[in-house]
Amino acid sequence: MVRNRFLANRKSAKTAFCKEFRTMAHYNTVFHTLAKILPRHEIDRFDRKYGQGDKRRQSSRYVQFIVMLMAQILDLKSLREIEQAQKSNQKRLYHLGVKSPVSRSALSRMNDERSADFFKDVFQQMLQSCKALAPGSQFKLPGVNSLILMDATTIQLCLDVFPWATYTQTKGALKLHFGLNDDGYLPDFMVATTGKVHEINVAKSLDYQPGSMICMDRGYTDYDWWEELTRKGIYFVTRLKSNAVYDEIRRRAGRRSKNIVDDETIKLKGIQTPFRLIHYISPEDQHEYHFITNAMHLPAQTIADIYKERWQIELFFKWVNQNQKIKIFLDTSANAVMT
């Protein structure tokens, strides 16, 4: 009886080990495949840009990037695990330019002291490469160059451990602000801030190309900003808050789909620029939505379809949460977290 239990436990342990080994082997294959297609010359260029004044004996930012990429893909949870994984994969890492393992103390110091802007530049460079291969947008909108789906997601942090990441008096958080391009569903921009920074403040600080269209939720309500976008030739689509005060200028003529209740030109209180307000009944739940936009030339149903497309950024956030392993941070400083 005891022997049978021992053999069963041994078999179970062996099965678990084999499963873990196969998983690690898969992650290693993914990591090395990805590492080989990195734009090494571009990363070296950014290394030279940010590396002025570095001590000569320090590892390059390319090495730091490869080690951190390995940690992310292999789901390593501590500096000690990263150090051990480098030793286990030393031959493979050598061929990727990591000549010797980076100690955990050295890696901690790099993440804490080296500007995270290096990784922002690498991200933007790789993003441009991905965009060249991305499929086109399903929306072919006259006069609109690109459709940007805008929103933000929050990562909760312990305020005692991350005192710089203020959110409320008792909570800490990191907020990621995204602008997802409908053309391939890749981000046009990503801005990381502390949790207390409101989405509208980040949105107003960004530059948008004339002819682009921003689709966003009611958290981005700012009448003056909407007016500024209109002056610059930038379109927007969002929902009007229920307490908004406005005057109807005229009802818009033209054919409407059966789900369009009304289509009117309005003036919001305190704003001279006229906007367009569309009243829409959703066929799915029969709920009435009120869309406001400055795109006067598009059919009302198209405006409703554009706002429906905003759901794609929610799916993007869900995908990030499922695939981006942000369970722990290797250090507590703001620069290390951004890295």
Language model segments and positions:
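A glycine- and small-aliphatic-rich helix-loop capping segment at beta-alpha/alpha-beta transitions
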Residues: 165
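Single, function-defining residue in the core of a domain
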Residues: 2-81, 85, 112-114, 121-125, ...
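Acidic/polar active-site rim loop that often engages polyanionic ligands
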Residues: 87, 102, 106, 208
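Extended, structured, electrostatic nucleic-acid-contact surfaces
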Residues: 87-97
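Major-groove recognition helix of helix-turn-helix-like DNA-binding domains
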Residues: 95-114
